[in-house]
């Protein structure tokens, strides 16, 4: 997915642009205790999320990457909800945070729709916004995070 991903290295240098560095980055993600999830359409991976544990046991940083051909069709929402559900239920996370480009309107809409809110007082620049979501939100408490059973032509799985 990442070899054809656009825009390359557009936000915080991720995903890495050069192929050798991309391979190193993916290897680090798999071997450093990062929780990884992928979404595929039966032929190839079209999305990837990761939860990186923070200094506190019940917090993590989230990153999400959706191939440009699949943005706006629900795959990102399904993958995001599945990842958050796993973080809430299996990892017992109390807080999930991420950074997003302030100009990325599609991502901001998606994130806000699943409960992320801007972090007040964060050192945000015009192009970057820190957001967080309490994992003990009503969606997780009410068993509404049903993302692994979505009706899209995609499959979501933990890697």
Where are these regions (language model features)?
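Conserved acetyl-CoA-binding loop of GNAT-fold acetyltransferases
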Residues: 112-122
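A structural signal for short, well-ordered beta-strand segments
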Residues: 49, 62, 98, 127-129
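Structured catalytic core of nucleotide-sugar glycosyltransferases
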Residues: 2-12, 17, 26, 83, ...
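Acetyl-CoA-dependent GNAT
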Residues: 4, 12-61, 67
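Conserved acetyl-CoA-binding loop-helix of GNAT-fold acetyltransferases
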Residues: 66, 72-87, 109-113
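Conserved GNAT acetyl-CoA-binding A-motif
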Residues: 87-100
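C-terminal "cap" of GNAT-fold acetyltransferases
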Residues: 121-159
């Amino acid at each position: 997915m990442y070899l054809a991903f656009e825009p390359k290295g557009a936000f915080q240098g991720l995903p890495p642009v050069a192929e050798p560095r991309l391979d190193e980055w993916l290897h680090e993600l798999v071997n450093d205790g990062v929780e990884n999830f992928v979404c595929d359409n039966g032929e190839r991976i079209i999305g990837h999320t990761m939860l990186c544990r923070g200094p506190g046991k019940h917090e993590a940083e989230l990153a999400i990457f959706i191939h440009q051909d699949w943005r706006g069709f629900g795959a990102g929402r399904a993958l995001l909800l599945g990842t958050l559900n796993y973080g809430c239920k299996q990892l017992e996370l109390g807080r999930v945070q991420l950074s997003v480009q302030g100009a990325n309107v599609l991502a901001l809409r998606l994130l806000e729709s699943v409960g992320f809110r801007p972090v007040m007082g964060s050192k945000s620049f015009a192009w970057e916004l820190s957001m967080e979501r309490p994992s003990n939100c009503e969606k997780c408490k009410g068993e509404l995070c049903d993302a692994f059973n979505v009706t899209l032509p995609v499959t979501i799985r933990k890697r």
